[in-house]
Curated annotation (Swiss-Prot):
Disulfide bonds join 41-55, 48-67, 54-82, 85-92. GO terms for molecular function: ion channel regulator activity; toxin activity. It holds the Pfam family Cys_Knot_tox. The lineage of its organism: Eukaryota, Metazoa, Ecdysozoa, Arthropoda, Chelicerata. This is Toxin ICK-19. It comes from Trittame loki. Probable neurotoxin with ion channel impairing activity. Its main location: secreted. GO terms for cellular component: extracellular region. Keywords: Disulfide bond, Glycoprotein, Ion channel impairing toxin, Knottin, Neurotoxin, Secreted, Signal, Toxin. The presence of a 'disulfide through disulfide knot' structurally defines this protein as a knottin. It is found in: Secreted. InterPro entries: Cys_Knot_tox. Residues 1-19 form the signal peptide.
Length: 92
C-alpha cells in the first residue's frame, strides 16, 4: 500500500511541476485581432500552420506565442496548435 501512495504522490507532483502536456495557455490573457487577410487570429489550442496566425499575449515581455507541434490523442498524430506560454518556463 505504501509504494502505491508514494507513486501517486510522485505523479501528482510531476503534473503540478511540469504542467499538463496539452496546456496551450488559453487562460493567459491574449489579444484577439483581425489579421491582414481578414480572418481573426487563432486562440491558444486552435490548429495553425504559421506563427503569425496565432493571437499574441497581452504581456509580450513575460509571455511568448506561436504555432507549435503537439501530440493529439484524438487524431493519433502530431498537429500544429497555437500556444502561449510563460517565457521563463522550461516548457516554453
Amino acid at each position: 500500500m505504501k509504494p502505491i501512495v508514494s507513486i501517486l504522490i510522485f505523479c501528482a507532483l510531476a503534473v503540478v511541476i511540469m504542467g499538463h502536456p496539452l496546456d496551450s495557455g488559453y487562460g493567459i490573457p491574449h489579444i484577439v485581432e483581425k489579421l491582414p487577410n481578414g480572418q481573426w487570429c487563432k486562440t491558444p489550442g486552435d490548429d495553425c500552420s504559421k506563427n503569425n496566425e496565432c493571437c499574441k499575449p497581452k504581456d509580450p515581455e513575460n509571455y511568448s506565442s506561436g504555432c507549435a507541434s503537439q501530440w493529439s490523442g484524438m487524431q493519433g498524430k502530431r498537429v500544429n496548435m497555437c500556444r502561449i506560454c510563460y517565457i521563463e518556463s522550461s516548457m516554453c
